[in-house]
Amino acid sequence: MNRLSYLFLPLTAIGVSACSSNKAKEEVKRPNIIFMMTDDHTTQAMSCYGGRLLQTPNMDRIANEGIRMDNCYAVNALSGPSRACILTGKFSHINGFTDNASTFDGNQQTFPKLLQSAGYQTSIIGKWHLITEPQGFDYWCILTGQHEQGDYYNPDFNENGKQIVEQGYATDIITDKAIEYLEHRDKSKPFCMMYHQKAPHRNWMPAPRHLGMFNNTVFPEPATLFDTYEGRGSAAREQDMSIEHTLTNDWDLKLLTREEMLKDTTNRLYQVYKRMPADVQNKWDSVYAQRIAEYRSGKLEGKELISWKYQQYMRDYLATIVAVDENIGRLLSYLEKIGELDNTIIIYTSDQGFFLGEHGWFDKRLSLIHISEPTRQAEIS
């Protein structure tokens, strides 16, 4: 991978294809770009940021061989708007995509269009979540369904305007498609690929191979898990993202048996459960049976119940990230295999961060607001 000295110059000179020397003009091989984005991944769940919850060796590799940004903030704490800001370089009120009910105006300038006009092959594979079809890409294969959030199991895609269904787990499939695209690209041109995972977006559904992997793990609780918000403004008390009150028993905690889901097939959890193959459904039932039994034992209440909910949330959220890290490793290995790793700028980010129990919360949407201390006035004599 490109080290620090190579990370910025190619982006400022992207249209330059040759340089001069006293002896001859030699062609400069322009760098490839892979922009990796996950959904709702937070630094607390990345070991390269000192997170103690999960080891992420492949993300760590990107950080160790490049640079790690320690002071970056999302312009908008919602999925679609954050993506629109990244594409356009504009604030939400200027690019027009202010919330997830908006529709993206693809006619405006975006960085993939600029790269495409400079001779790059451009592609986006995975989550798009901007309603309109992508523009400025030679190839796209984007998740559809669940209001364009996409599904974890047997997901639907829009592939260059054609609707398809793929069998398997979304995080793996998106990587399969990314590698397949790289195999068949025009190798005479540099490429820019936006590699966008759905994971670990709510409701945190791990890959079949990772179901239950943390069932016997007890994760450390944040010091503010039982925060009462005393002395704080009304927003802290009135938020709707608390582990105690907002986590749902069905969608988030998955506290429904197969029989209960079949009694009400309109249930949101059943809509994703029914997409699983029979063997995955059986494993799911087995893994979550213990959780359901614990919850229904009648022994959990008060702070003990909050702690229990926190552990279930962490087990699903972190297990979902494991597949993300594994697949980053697959993609890095493929680039190494074809000899393109050292000529590829790799950027990893998330559309925004996420609370992992801090202040008893599990979601996002907290504005970065800093109020400076008023300047002290000089005494008037």
What are these regions (language model features)?
Residues 2-8, 12, 18-372, 376:
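Formylglycine-dependent sulfatase
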Residues 380-381:
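Hydrophobic alpha-helical segments, chiefly the membrane-spanning helices
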